[in-house]
């Protein structure tokens, strides 16, 4: 079960990154090109949010039911080890903040002028995307050295 959930979690990461970059680029293009906020812009944010929702569910299942890491049972010990601390505290905290930002951004883009909606999307989706880039255990980081790209 752990391996299957971990693979799904990893694949969803790539979908989140693609949807996030797409939503950010659409909002940036809308601002610079002074374009109307269209249904396609709304759908870009919607898919970004949906992939985040799925990722949160899989992540929670991994964290509470399937993960072999025991940091949650020994927080004092987990805080002393940077890798266990990352997976026990930092990864989840940043993920939840990014999740909330995407949901707030999606809700706020439903009202306002086209320019305001694009700016709101860029702000909330952009910050969430930066957090995702920071919370992923990339293979070039110590926390992801054994993970690989997928």
Where are these regions (language model features)?
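Membrane-embedded alpha-helical bundles that constitute the cytochrome b-like, heme-associated redox core
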Residues: 1-150
């Amino acid at each position: 079960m752990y391996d299957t959930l971990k693979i799904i979690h990893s694949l969803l990461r790539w979908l989140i990154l693609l949807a996030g970059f797409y939503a950010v680029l659409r909002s940036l293009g809308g601002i610079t090109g002074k374009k109307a906020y269209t249904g396609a812009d709304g759908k870009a944010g919607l898919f970004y949010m949906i992939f985040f929702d799925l990722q949160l569910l899989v992540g929670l299942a991994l964290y509470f039911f399937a993960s072999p890491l025991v940091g949650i049972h020994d927080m004092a010990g987990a805080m002393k080890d940077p890798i266990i601390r990352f997976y026990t505290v930092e990864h989840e905290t940043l993920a939840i903040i990014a999740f909330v930002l995407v949901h707030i951004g999606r809700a706020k883009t439903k009202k306002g002028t086209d320019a305001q909606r694009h700016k709101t999307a860029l702000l909330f989706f952009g910050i969430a995307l930066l957090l995702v880039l920071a919370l992923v255990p990339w293979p070039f980081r110590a926390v992801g050295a054994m993970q690989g790209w997928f």
